[in-house]
Amino acid sequence: MQIDVARVLGLVTRSVRNFEMDGKAASAVTLTRLYETDVDDLWDALTSKERIPRWFLPIEGDLQLGGKYQLKGNAGGTITACTPPRHFAATWEFGGATSWIDVRLAAERDKARLTLEHTAVIEDHWNQFGPGAVGIGWDLALAGLEGYLATGASVDHETAEAWMGSPEGKGFMTESGEFWRAAHVASGVDPASAKERSDRTIAFYRGEMPPDIAHPGTGS
């Protein structure tokens, strides 16, 4: 498995937004990038039960408005909005916590732009790990999507898991985490606090924290 880490991560624009939601402090991480395809094809890759496992994870459920979904070994939830081929939103329920994803597609010249926003209420895990908790995972997913759209070849999940433990894979986690640290600082967070959280998250994704530490993306 070969990924040009610097190139792939450099294609993504990242931001962090802090705000109040239903009287609680919340934060949204946003990733946006272009893909070498059209909106209809990108929409199908993101929403087809047959195609999602080819670049992300096996999925079960009813993939339509109001339907429930479950990603194997990961999040599940309910689809709360769906306007093909431009927009969908869903709850993201994982590790006992609920957050929210919002995905928008737009044509841009001969390409398709994907914008993904993941919103969570700020709780202990956010204060411990920061935006990289979900941001690194989404960087990995968007890289997998690029590879699939470019070649049509499905991700071999065993190979991908082995790659994540390789020096190149660990380098991806580190560089992604540093991008998220910078986005966190740009949102107005104290740089020292942002670095402490990103260092912790990078260590987790690199497999350098005790195994009993909960996944930083759970939010619980």
Residue ranges of predicted features:
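Terminal "cap-and-tail" regions of soluble proteins that handle hydrophobic small molecules
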Residues: M1-G23, T119-S220
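Short beta-edge strand/loop motif at the mouth of beta-sheet-based domains
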Residues: D22-K24, A28-L31, T37-D41, K49-H87
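Hydrophobic/aromatic beta-strand elements that line small-molecule binding cavities or substrate pockets
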Residues: R33, G77-I79, W100-A107
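Hydrophobic alpha-helical segments that drive targeting, anchoring, or assembly
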Residues: Y35, A75-T78, W92-F94, E117
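Hydrophobic pocket/interface hotspot
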Residues: L42-W43, I52, I79, F88-A90, ...
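Short strand-connecting beta-turns/loops that link adjacent beta-strands
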Residues: P84, G95-A97, E108-K111
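Active-site-adjacent structural patch at catalytic or cofactor/ligand-binding sites
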Residues: A97-V103, E117-T119
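Short acidic, glycine/tyrosine-flanked loop/strand segments centered on an H-E-D-like triad
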Residues: A107-E123
